[in-house]
């Protein structure tokens, strides 16, 4: 047994050494790798008003797959010294000009350097084809945001957190499991996108028969997309609303399809994801190692949120006394997108301050 272990370690070491030698080759140096040039809008085009308490600028950074991500950076006015930082993204299918930007700006008002970023293949970020979701690449997006924040001269690299909204709440927790640089994580009104993709809403499609039917349909769509040379879009939030739409669909419509939250770069506001984007989510499960997450997590949900079960079930998988579940009285799922009377922003800021103390 000892000989077998030694052989495995030797093989692993040789692979890692080979990779190290490749990275030392100037032809593979990240510093000379081609970087996507993004056309970024410089005017204020958010769905929320600009704060006079923070400074704002556009920034870009590159993830491990070479995709350039676009972000809005918010810095407290008259900031001095190194500050704690938070990367924000979500909801799933939204853009940084919507809910994530509001959270980022609000937290900057409370003393944090923040960025709200567009995930790969969406918004102003790079990547092709457009409107593709990937549980692997999207968790990498959050870690890439941490890469970027870690090297900023005004950021305390030992005090970096992440905040994910809706589907990006689950992605934030999954990233934190694998990235111990993330000292604290907040998942607001979270979805587990891998669960809903495989099992349907409220787990009503949780059977091999239904999943196999979905796989067959998506496989056929792949063939059709390849034949056509383009990707069929799934459509954003349904519009007009059917008379029998569930309340949570009405709530989505009230945000994404009205001046309250509509943005032309948002998939949810327009024509949605590529139909086949659901495939990798069906084939991947978050939170397999959730019990190993040592750093702090806060999960918050509205009392009336249809998505509440995602957060409560995920919370049960976490270990340690630095995990919190906060239920907001009377709030729906979408109330926690932009309703500042419902979003416990001070509690969120206090959580980050407590769990990311200055050393």
Q: Model-found features: residue ranges?
A:
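Short beta-strand element of the alpha/beta-hydrolase
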Residues: 81-91
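The serine-hydrolase catalytic nucleophile loop
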Residues: 93-105, 119, 311
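Alpha/beta-hydrolase active-site loop
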Residues: 132-153
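Alpha/beta-hydrolase-fold enzymes
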Residues: 173-257
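Short beta-strand/loop motif that positions the catalytic acidic residue
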Residues: 293, 299-301
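Catalytic histidine-centered segment of alpha/beta-hydrolase-like enzymes
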Residues: 331-342
